[in-house]
């Protein structure tokens, strides 16, 4: 028993353990001291190793670890290393996720609904789509049941499909005439006239002969700042013509300001007339007043009396014979 007893003095000259390979198993204080010394020595070695040597050491240590120790390492790595692709809807509260989705346009919400089932349930909430429908005064003519989900989204899609999109109408042939290019008298036949000069001369002659006649629309060159790549949300985009005029007005001040105001006023009046004509055309068409949209299930109205209810139940059972199930009945004995 005396051979395994702990030594009386630890700091003596015989108890220096820095250069020894002895591991005290029965003395906890000496064991902790040896462990700290060897851990510091291992850290110095690890600092001097190359990257490949460090990888080999880490791989060997992970292979020696048990399952619980490997899970511990995994948790530590997740705390130290930030996640590259983290679903914010799983970490943030549901209210904040819905608030973030409320800033998206309808097309982006439809794309978000294709990510996962949870995103689909968030992107089809009535709290998001109801505001987008009420923005254009699109209401539903019924009160949905608590089990109907995504009613306002379907209503928005249906109303967008029913929008009256008018195609651009080509002007009649009588309004525009082709340019009749003729040589100006007085020039020698040998001289060649440029096409632009000939077009200007013919247009000036046509103006003098027919002052009330309309001209051909001017040819528009390619846009230096193309807008074709801009996302096409046609319900949210502003009028490009008004935006262009406002930008030009801010950038430069033209001397003929009255003429620009008059042209702008005429354009606005033309748009108002066009909208009025479109509304008259829509009013002349037969109105469609759906009592209820097509997607909700129509439940049969409960009849008032008992006989009508029995007849409706019998008709329903005849249409669906698989629903009939024999049920035992108790016969009362007289």
From Swiss-Prot:
Compositional bias segments (type: Low complexity): 194-204, 323-334
TM region(s), chain numbering: none
Protein name per its UniProtKB record: F-box only protein 16
Organism encoding this protein: Mus musculus (Mouse)
PROSITE patterns hit by this protein: FBOX
Positions with biased composition (Basic and acidic residues): 210-222
F-box domain segment(s): 86-132
Pfam families, A to Z: F-box-like
